[in-house]
């Protein structure tokens, strides 16, 4: 029942639908009380042989009319109740998706993709089922059960009612004990399902590697092992589940046996009529649903509770919380200042960055270089707030970037990574991904800056040429230039190029770098991280990072003078290699 309390906010939000549904359920419960009474009257009339005088046909028509009304009302409550619960599914998934979009890399290191998919699909379904079927069974079982018992006591015999319901408290105690077992079993089964889902997702993503190394059988066996584990967990649930209905039917049968035995005895002493006993047995039959529903409700609620706890453990109770107030970011390009005292990843003891201090003004180009694994990519992630800095400060306009809304902060930046991603769409649509309503003139201006326009005009359909699986195959350099054009189109205040020119030739690289000089005249800041030091010649400031620390800082002309240090030595080596 704790789950229903935790979903109170949603029941209040959808109170109209739930109120109408509950009202209809109450109406149905009341209407269902009449047919057994009327059938008992018909039986007594038949036994007394008063069929000619008694209104048998009207009684039959009343029973038929009530049945039709009940059918219509059942249809209507389904629309209101399940309509409301399905809205919960949409709301939960949107909120969870938005929450996931705002998380940083640390979050995705803790939670695997398959597990997240399982929680946003399978677990949400279980919670929604509890908000729909769970509420139905709770309300219907209580109202129907109480109503029938009241009628049995007041209209037929209180003695017969008490004797017939003796097995019910025992059944309730047993159901409660099963509920606790079900909760832990469902939680374990959902966790195992998440592992299975995640394993399948990882294997499908890397199927080309599995095939390349001939590891199909090996990974199939591992998958089978996890599938068997999932099967065992579900069988455990099925075993507990399978005891529910037999126990309920056993106690219902005992109730019927007591009713018929004691009722027959009461007929002989004229305490009740045969028709009343038949009505009583029919009423007892109406209690079967509340009993089954009550047990089923525990089943549904425990499933939903286990799933809700899994969702909460993922979001750390941060869903639907009041959003923090952030400072506004000026639309005027500002100074970006980085002061990193110390940084390491949460699951590692290794220091990634330390004593990183630099400042870059609007319109300047910052070059970042250094050996592989020195911390360059981590620095870029910290600036983008993909990961959070705990010891130090990164400021823009002299305001720490943590005080800005993360979405608004990222809108200030355009990022081009070494690994490019293109949709199966036209070249134009791929370029205007971040600015869907960009004009053709704006697109062509961006491709001119990225030295791609002439290449595109050689394609059969120009900017409308399809790329991807069903289109033409582009070279690595062309893909990178589409990504650069996509970023330049946004005209963001900060442009981050992370090895973005690694696949282009020297001539194209020179053209792009010259074009960027023109592009940044609007005071755009460029941060360029690269292994190719020739790309940094025109940088206003270059920092060399080795083992997480800045070992050299200055302009290109200054840094190449010292051939004993990394920058001068590497630049000379690359220059000789090119020749």
Swiss-Prot record:
It catalyses: ATP + H2O + xenobioticSide 1 = ADP + phosphate + xenobioticSide 2. ATP binds at residues 370-377. Signal peptide: none annotated. It is found in: Cell membrane. GO terms for cellular component: plasma membrane. GO terms for molecular function: ABC-type oligopeptide transporter activity; ABC-type xenobiotic transporter activity; ATP binding; ATP hydrolysis activity. PROSITE patterns: ABC_TM1F, ABC_TRANSPORTER_1, ABC_TRANSPORTER_2. The chain crosses the membrane at residues 20-40, 53-73, 134-154, 155-175, 247-267, 281-301. The keyword Membrane applies. It comes from the Bacteria. The keyword Transport applies. It is a multi-pass membrane protein. InterPro entries: AAA+_ATPase (IPR003593), ABC1_TM_dom (IPR011527), ABC1_TM_sf (IPR036640), ABC_transporter-like_ATP-bd (IPR003439), ABC_transporter-like_CS (IPR017871), P-loop_NTPase (IPR027417), Type_1_exporter (IPR039421). Its EC number is 7.6.2.2. Disulfide bonds: none annotated. Residues 18-303 form the ABC transmembrane type-1 domain. Keywords: ATP-binding, Cell membrane, Membrane, Nucleotide-binding, Translocase, Transmembrane, Transmembrane helix, Transport. SMART domains: AAA. CDD domains: ABC_6TM_TmrB_like. Its main location: membrane. Belongs to the ABC transporter superfamily. Drug exporter-2 (TC 3.A.1.117) family. This is Multidrug resistance-like ATP-binding protein MdlA. The gene is mdlA.
């Amino acid at each position: 029942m704790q789950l229903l309390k935790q979903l109170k906010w949603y029941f209040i939000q959808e109170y109209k639908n739930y109120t109408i549904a509950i009202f209809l359920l109450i109406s149905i419960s009341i209407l269902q009380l009449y047919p057994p009474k009327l059938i008992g009257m018909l039986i007594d009339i038949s036994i007394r042989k008063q069929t000619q005088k008694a209104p048998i046909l009207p009684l039959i028509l009343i029973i038929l009319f009530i049945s039709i009304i009940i059918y219509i009302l059942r249809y209507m409550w389904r629309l209101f109740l399940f309509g409301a619960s399905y809205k919960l599914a949409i709301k939960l998934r949107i909120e969870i998706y938005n929450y996931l979009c705002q998380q940083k890399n640390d979050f995705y290191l803790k939670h695997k993709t398959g597990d997240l998919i399982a929680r946003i699909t399978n677990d949400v379904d279980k919670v929604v089922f509890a908000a729909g079927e769970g509420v139905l069974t709770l309300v219907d079982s209580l109202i129907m059960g109480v109503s029938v018992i009241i009628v049995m006591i007041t209209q037929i015999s209180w003695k017969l009612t008490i004797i017939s319901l003796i097995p019910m408290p025992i059944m309730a105690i047993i159901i409660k004990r099963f509920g606790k077992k079900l909760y832990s079993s469902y939680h374990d089964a959902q966790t195992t399902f998440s592992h299975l889902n995640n394993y399948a997702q990882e294997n499908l993503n890397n199927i080309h590697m599995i095939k390349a190394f001939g590891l199909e059988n090996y990974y199939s066996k591992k998958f089978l092992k996890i599938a068997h584990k999932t099967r065992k967990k579900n069988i455990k649930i099925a075993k507990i589940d399978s005891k529910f209905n037999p126990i309920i039917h056993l106690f219902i049968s005992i109730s019927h046996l007591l009713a018929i035995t004691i009722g027959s005895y009461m007929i002989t002493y004229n305490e009740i009529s045969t028709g009343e006993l038949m009505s009583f047995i029919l009423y007892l039959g109406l209690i079967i649903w509340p009993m089954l529903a009550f047990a089923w409700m525990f089943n549904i609620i425990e499933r939903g509770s286990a799933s809700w706890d899994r969702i909460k453990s993922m979001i750390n109770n941060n869903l639907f919380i009041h959003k923090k107030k952030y400072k506004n970011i000026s639309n005027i390009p500002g100074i970006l200042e980085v002061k990193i005292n110390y940084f390491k990843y949460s699951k590692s003891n290794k220091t990634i960055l330390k004593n990183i201090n630099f400042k870059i003004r609007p319109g300047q180009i910052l070059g970042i270089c250094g050996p592989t694994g020195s911390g360059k990519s981590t620095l870029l992630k910290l600036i983008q707030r993909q990961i959070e800095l705990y010891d130090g400060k990164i400021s823009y306009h002299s305001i720490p970037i943590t005080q800005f809304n993360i979405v608004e902060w990222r809108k200030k930046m355009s990022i081009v990574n070494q690994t490019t991603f293109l949709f199966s769409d036209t070249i134009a649509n791929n370029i205007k991904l971040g600015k869907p309503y960009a004009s053709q003139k704006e697109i062509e201006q961006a491709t001119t800056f990225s030295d791609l326009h002439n290449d595109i005009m050689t394609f059969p359909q120009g900017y409308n040429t399809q790329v991807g699986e069903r289109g033409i195959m582009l070279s690595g350099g062309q893909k990178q230039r589409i990504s650069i054009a996509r970023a330049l189109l946004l005209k963001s205040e900060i442009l981050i190029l992370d090895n973005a020119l690694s696949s282009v030739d020297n001539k194209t690289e020179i053209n792009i770098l010259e074009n960027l000089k023109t592009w940044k005249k609007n005071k755009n800041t460029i941060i360029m991280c690269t292994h190719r030091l020739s790309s940094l010649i025109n940088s206003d400031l270059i920092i060399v990072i080795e083992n997480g620390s800045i070992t050299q800082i200055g302009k290109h002309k200054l840094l190449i003078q010292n051939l004993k240090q990394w920058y001068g030595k590497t630049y000379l080596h690359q220059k000789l290699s090119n020749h």
